[in-house]
């Protein structure tokens, strides 16, 4: 497997053939679902996971970072929470609680291989609760 050699090189990553998009399985008390993520860039030591507001908002207002993060070679992840834009839409309001959303973010973090040595969380509104 080839290792990425530059900021925009997706070689050797499980999202190499999807332009950075990855659907991540999420396990909840109401069933199993998938949430949408998209990685931009390649930087093993500087990553940001973007947490949007809501419930029900989308990643789209974070797209402004496309004008800033690449210049600093920061790897970043868009993520639509369950019931948002490209993620599954169970339309079950019992899933809209802080504890469940925290668990969802933890499942996303683990699946993406993010840990305290390489990631920062950036949340707005509901995303920073």
Predicted ranges, named:
Residues 45-54:
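Short beta-strand element of the alpha/beta-hydrolase
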Residues 99-119:
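Conserved acidic catalytic loop of the alpha/beta-hydrolase fold
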Residues 88-102:
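Catalytic nucleophile-loop/oxyanion-hole region of alpha/beta-hydrolase
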């Amino acid at each position: 497997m080839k290792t990425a050699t530059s900021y925009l090189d997706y070689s050797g990553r499980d999202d190499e053939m999807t332009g950075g998009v990855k659907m991540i399985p999420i396990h909840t008390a109401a069933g199993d679902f998938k949430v949408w993520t998209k990685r931009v860039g390649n930087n093993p030591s500087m990553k940001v996971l973007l947490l949007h507001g809501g419930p029900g908002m989308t990643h789209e207002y974070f797209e402004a970072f496309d004008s800033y993060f690449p210049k600093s070679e920061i790897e970043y992840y868009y993520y639509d929470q369950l019931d948002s834009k490209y993620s599954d839409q169970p339309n079950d309001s019992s899933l809209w609680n802080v504890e469940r959303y925290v668990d969802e973010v933890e499942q996303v973090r683990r699946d993406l291989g993010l840990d305290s040595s390489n990631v920062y969380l950036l949340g707005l509104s509901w995303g920073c609760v």
